[in-house]
Amino acid sequence: ENRAVLEKSFIIPYIGEDLLNRLTEKDRFYALCAEVGVPVPRTVVFDASADGDDPATVTLPFPFPVVAKPASSAAYHYADFPGKQKVFFLRDATELRATLAAVQSSRYEGKLLIQETIPGDDTSMRILTTYSDRDGKVRFASFGQTLLEDMRPMGVGNPLAIASRTDETIVTEAARLLEAVGYTGFANFDIKLDERDGSFRFFEVNTRCGRNTYYMSLGGQNFVELIVREFLLGETIDY
């Protein structure tokens, strides 16, 4: 938002506000994934604003149980209502409608995503952290498998233990998405293995280093070093 002012005195190795919103607002992120052919869960978008969609009329093209989560985590942070959770796991239409109504009654005015459940426990989750240089080329990737996730209502999805792994197919998919939009800097993806057929679904991208980024350092690459080498020392980061 204040990039034009700040970059007069600081080096800012981050993307602009427009692209940030396009990637971090999950409904827009899924639309972008569809454009470039990156696989995501089947999703229905519900307008949770006060004069938005009617919870009673929502129909789904996939069976229960389903997952519901806010499109904008930043805006949802300020919403307060009984039973609030970071992610909702809903067994039937009654639970879905009650949840949609509860969210809609709060101060949250954004979209809510209703998604098919991708089966699998914590170990089905994958973490990918990438670094794209100032020209938008992905120069580094660190991939891991989640071993244990946070179970607290507002911490669901946060990995507590990660094991380093390798998967060039997923890295290639992520790089194709990032390079299509001219992304620069660090990106952190949440991805899940679909146990039914061995395919993967991209859940979201954080336009920053994740809270789990220290797993990169344990794997041999201090993530801060990449920014220092390119932006302060003028070096080229080779993949």
Residue ranges: model-predicted function:
Residues R22-L113, R134-D135, E168, T172:
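Active-site nucleotide/adenylate-binding loops and adjacent lid/helix of ATP-dependent enzymes
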Residues K84-A98, A102, E116-G182, N206-F231:
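ATP-dependent carboxylate/phosphate-activation module, predominantly the ATP-grasp catalytic core
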Residues G198-R208:
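A short beta-strand motif that forms the metal-chelation/ATP-contact edge
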Residues D238-Y239:
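A glycine-rich beta-turn/hairpin centered on an aromatic-Pro dipeptide
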